[in-house]
Amino acid sequence: SEIKSAHLKEDNLAYIVYLADNIAAFADRRKKEDTEEKGFDLSVPLQSVFNVLNGNNQRFYYQPGDMDDQGKINYPASEKKPFSREFYMKICQRMLDNFRGMNWSEEYLNSLLAVMEANLSYMPSSTSNEELSDISLFDHVKLTAAISSCIYDYLNENHLSYKTELFDKKDFYDRNAFLLCSMDI
């Protein structure tokens, strides 16, 4: 990985995000059954999570797009419309334009979240031919951020080095660094 060759300070947040992304990818990526395909396909659209739920074997896809300002919902359909390089470039440019006008402070976190949701909700997090493409990039990024926040708090609470604990040592996965809570109100 590129992080190995990077000359980063011991407390660089990249170490936290690197591990959090690996944990999130493990949680949201699943291998396709009965496939021999290798490599990546950047044109693959986001698939519906209901394709394989409860033993289903369906093929429904979201159309390349974003959250519509008009309130139209992008329902999955049987037609598989590929993503294009131009579509990815359009999304990148729109996000860059939004980021330029953003005040990077705690008050703008909801604005950042809204920009990410609007642009990445129908983009697959994985374009691997070996994996299902049914988790959006928005959901993957949001999960990565949540895990990063937990790791950050854990390391700082325990006065631990980011690089040593997350990258040099190999036992962080065995630590009780997370607490998952669920409740109904």
Model-derived features with residue positions:
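Regulatory/sensor and coupling segments of signal-transduction and defense proteins
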Residues: S1-I185
